[in-house]
């Protein structure tokens, strides 16, 4: 059968939360839920993860931070597994220009590049970082500088949460922007 895995998190976005994985070894007929991090303070909880499979049992995940403080603790989380999701490491990255904004990863197995898309809330900038997967795997502080892709709304809660996908050799990103109640979905293709 096909092995399937998905990450989960649970929180009320107030004080604490947990995260983990659900797995299936029978093509999704049955699932097993496992907690990896439990009762973590909200500032230490990786939420809304985006994962890519790098091959050879390696899974790379970037997750958002709920920490709004302008400190080194306000950075995206990098979760990694080298054994098909059995065990995990969790560390903060050097990506601190972001909070409460869902990331989106794309992995290009032909080039070995991983693309980390995210929206910088408050400043209103859609950003992307490009790294060789081998350079950041095991090295969460090694992400290169970001590139600004597009500008959007600056109200922190009315703009953000990018989703990106690779299509026909291009990357297409979608995010919401505006000022409530006048928000819209925007796209960029690179």
Question: What spans do the regions from the language model cover?
Answer:
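Asp-box/BNR beta-propeller blade signature and adjacent active/binding-site loops
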Residues: 1-190
């Amino acid at each position: 059968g096909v092995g399937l895995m998905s990450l989960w998190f649970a929180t009320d976005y107030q004080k604490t939360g947990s995260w983990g994985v659900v797995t299936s070894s029978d093509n999704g007929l049955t699932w097993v839920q496992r907690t990896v991090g439990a009762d973590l303070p909200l500032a230490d909880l990786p939420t809304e993860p985006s994962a890519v499979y790098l091959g050879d049992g390696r899974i790379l995940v970037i997750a958002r931070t709920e920490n709004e403080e302008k400190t080194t603790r306000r950075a995206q989380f990098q979760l990694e597994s080298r054994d098909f999701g059995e065990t995990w490491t969790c560390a903060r990255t050097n990506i601190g220009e972001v909070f409460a904004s869902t990331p989106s990863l794309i992995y290009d197995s032909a080039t070995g590049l991983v693309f980390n898309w995210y929206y910088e809330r408050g400043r209103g900038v859609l950003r992307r970082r490009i790294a060789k997967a081998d350079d950041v795997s095991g090295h969460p502080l090694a992400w290169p500088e970001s590139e600004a892709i597009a500008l959007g709304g600056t109200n922190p809660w009315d703009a953000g949460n990018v989703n990106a996908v690779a299509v026909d050799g291009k990357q297409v990103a979608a995010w919401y922007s505006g000022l409530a109640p006048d928000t819209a979905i925007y796209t960029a293709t690179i």
